[in-house]
Structures are given as C-alpha cells and as structure tokens.
C-alpha cells in the first residue's frame, strides 16, 4: 500500500468483531510503534498490552465509560517514560518523552490500518486511575489508550480543515 494512501485511509474504529488479534500481528504493531522518531534515539516510551477482560473494563470506566475499549480484543496503553529522556535532556526531556510517545501512537495507528485492523486514539481518561489500574511507576505517564481489533464498522473519513486554513508561510 502506498504510504499516502495509508495516511488518508486511516479512520477511528470504535466497533470491533470478537476475532482475536494474534501475537505475531501484535508484535508487528508494537515494532512499528518503536520505529517512530525519538529525541536523541532515547525511545522514551513504553507499551502496556492488555488482553484481560476485567482490566479492559476498568480502563474503559477510567476513560469516561468509553466501553468500546473493553470490547476490543487487545488494548495498548502508550506511556511516556520521563527518566529515559531526562537523563540526557534534563527537565526538557519530559516534553521529548511525550513527543516520543505520541509519535509511537501515530505509528501504531498506521500499522493497524496497514494490517487491515482498526483502532482509535483515546486521550480522554483519568491518568491517575489508569496509572493505578496498570501499576505504572510514578515516573511514567499514560499518553493514550489504543483499543485494537478487527473492524465491525466502516466509517467515512472525517472532514478536515483545508490545509490553506492551517498553513502559514514564512510567518504567522
């Protein structure tokens, strides 16, 4: 698949079939996440993979009761790992860790699309609850919950602002 076709084909999927995502496919998705750009190549991001139905339900409740999270066969929580970046960049490393994590999130979403699966970037959640549920160390911040599965819907791409409205040349 052409790269640009993939970018424009990606949509948010919130309805999944009950078909599982096998471990080999999951590893490809995680490897794609890890291939994302990274400040200083410090890769200040970590992935928590959840298949346990009860844990997925608790995550859904912590994410404003977005129950489609619990219905996905697998969920990846992408986390920023602050010390991994701060050891080189100091306090600014916090921002770089968050950038590393968000770059990985987009790679994961694109890999999912390339593999004919579906996913959605969930950013609306209670960070403290998610951290507690997943027993995250205090120096790690959950950045996104990504439910992944075989799509049970085929939504149309969402409308976007015209690029001309968002683009500034030479200055604002």
Swiss-Prot record:
Question: Which EC numbers does the record give?
Answer: 1.-.-.-
An example molecular function term from Gene Ontology annotations: oxidoreductase activity
Record carries keyword NAD: yes
Query: Per its UniProt record, what PANTHER family does this chain match?
Result: NAD(P)H NITROREDUCTASE YDGI-RELATED (PTHR43673), NADH DEHYDROGENASE_NAD(P)H NITROREDUCTASE XCC3605-RELATED (PTHR43673:SF10)
Which domain of life does the UniProt lineage start with? Archaea
Family from the record: Belongs to the nitroreductase family.
Name-wise, this protein is Putative NADH dehydrogenase/NAD(P)H nitroreductase AF_0226
Q: Which cofactor does it need?
A: FMN
Alphabetically sorted, this entry's keywords are: Flavoprotein, FMN, NAD, Oxidoreductase
Q: Which SUPFAM superfamilies match?
A: FMN-dependent nitroreductase-like
Query: Which organism does this record belong to?
Result: Archaeoglobus fulgidus (strain ATCC 49558 / DSM 4304 / JCM 9628 / NBRC 100126 / VC-16)
Read off the Pfam families from this record: Nitroreductase
